[in-house]
């Protein structure tokens, strides 16, 4: 059995996708330099902001996220799990929360659309309701050999 090193990246995402991509790349590069085989980005790595902005950006942001993951995997020669990012769903009033697993060669290995949506009232009084604008996917399991 060979050694395998995974890196779990933590970010403080904002409503500015470009700055989020820059911050994510810095962490991916660091993880790769330290020998990571797999880099996991957090949910909402590319955008964390108002629902109305997320819905407006969803189609563009979904493409940007997929391209970003492919570029990073190839550039740093790591497998990347891009934790949830918004993808348009239905009539445009909902998004799916999608994660993609991309191989070192930039090939999409697996895709997962979130099933269990999260609702909470934060201590600062701001409610967070994925169920309001989030689409629900169907259960499914994919097993991938990333070697």
Where are these regions (language model features)?
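Active-site catalytic loop in hydrolytic enzyme cores
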Residues: 61, 90-147
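Glycine-rich anion/phosphate-binding loops
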Residues: 18-25, 62-63
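Active-site beta-strand/loop signature of hydrolases that rely on acidic residues for catalysis
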Residues: 6-9, 20, 28-57, 73, ...
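Active-site environment of divalent metal-dependent phosphoester hydrolases
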Residues: 47-48, 88-90
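A short, hydrophobic beta-strand-centered structural micro-motif
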Residues: 62-88
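Beta-strand-turn-beta hairpins that frame and shape the catalytic cleft
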Residues: 1-6, 143-147
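Generic structural signal for well-ordered alpha-helices
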Residues: 28, 66-69, 141
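Short polar catalytic/cofactor-binding loops
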Residues: 10-16
């Amino acid at each position: 059995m060979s050694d395998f090193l995974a890196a779990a990246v933590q970010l403080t995402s904002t409503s500015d996708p470009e700055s989020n991509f820059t911050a994510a790349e810095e962490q991916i590069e660091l993880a790769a330099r330290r020998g990571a085989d797999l880099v996991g980005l957090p949910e909402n790595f590319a955008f964390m902001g108002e629902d109305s902005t997320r819905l407006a950006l969803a189609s563009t942001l979904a493409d940007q996220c997929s391209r970003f993951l492919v570029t990073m995997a190839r550039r740093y020669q790591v497998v990347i799990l891009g934790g949830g990012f918004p993808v348009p769903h239905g009539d445009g009033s909902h998004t799916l929360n999608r994660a993609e697993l991309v191989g070192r060669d930039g090939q999409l290995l697996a895709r997962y659309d979130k099933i269990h949506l999260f609702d909470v009232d934060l201590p600062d009084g701001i409610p967070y309701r994925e169920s309001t604008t989030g689409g629900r996917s169907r259960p499914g399991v994919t097993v991938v050999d990333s070697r």
